[in-house]
Amino acid sequence: MKSLHAVNLVLLLLLACFAPAPATRELNLRAAASDSTRVVDNATTERLLRAHSSGKEEQKEEEERAISINFPSLEKILKNVTSGKSTELQGMLKADEALGSAFKTLKLSTMRIGKDDTKMVAKFLSSRNFKIWFQHAVKINKDDPYGEMLKALTNVFGEKNVAMMILVGNLSRNSRDVAKKLEKAQFYKWYFVDKYKTADEVFTNVLKADRNRIHGYGREKEIWGDYAKYVTTTVMKY
């Protein structure tokens, strides 16, 4: 009898240890429900965030499209202004107007310029007015527009000063192209028209400098050197 009672007592103890208490079961159920709710809430939040982000991106794209449609680009505006100004300048010239007269009509003769000031020369040679003047030179003499321009510039500034302007014009990226072509026209004139076969002749007759003191001249010496190279190349070519 005592043995049976002992067995029953052991069974009761085992049941008490392994069977979950009601409070524990309730806590576990609540935790599971909470986790499930949290997953649902997180998924909903992510969908809302994606929808909000997508909405903002669409709104931004619509605003950008509206700006591109309603406002022309700055480049287009500047192009229209430049085109209008060029047309106005071209309208100032007569079709058969002499190049020297056109130089004054386009107010190039009133532009401030120092013959050996690189910035001022570059601004002069790259100005819109000068470009319109070049276009007019092409109409007058399409075979040698730079020769015509050189002649007109020489009449205004003098041969030595034009040579100086061309030299410093080569130093600036903005004016280098036109300066190189004017230089070619000038060297051609010196060699084939004026018959200056040596750089020393140009140094003395055009630049009005003393050959014996050549190292005392800066710009003149550079022109002398450039023309000496031209003469050498021309002699070898012909």
UniProtKB/Swiss-Prot annotation:
Domain of life per record: Eukaryota
Motif placement: RxLR-dEER: 47-65
Signal peptide, first to last residue: 1-23
GO cellular component, one term: host cytoskeleton
Keywords: Host cytoplasm, Host cytoskeleton, Host nucleus, Secreted, Signal, Virulence
Cellular localisation: Secreted; Host cytoplasm, Host cytoskeleton; Host nucleus, Host nucleolus; Host cytoplasm
Induction comment: Expression is induced during host plant infection.
Family indicated by similarity: Belongs to the RxLR effector family.
Its biological purpose: Effector that enhances P.infestans colonization of Nicotiana benthamiana leaves.
Record note on domains: The RxLR-dEER motif acts to carry the protein into the host cell cytoplasm through binding to cell surface phosphatidylinositol-3-phosphate.
The protein's name: RxLR effector protein PITG_14788
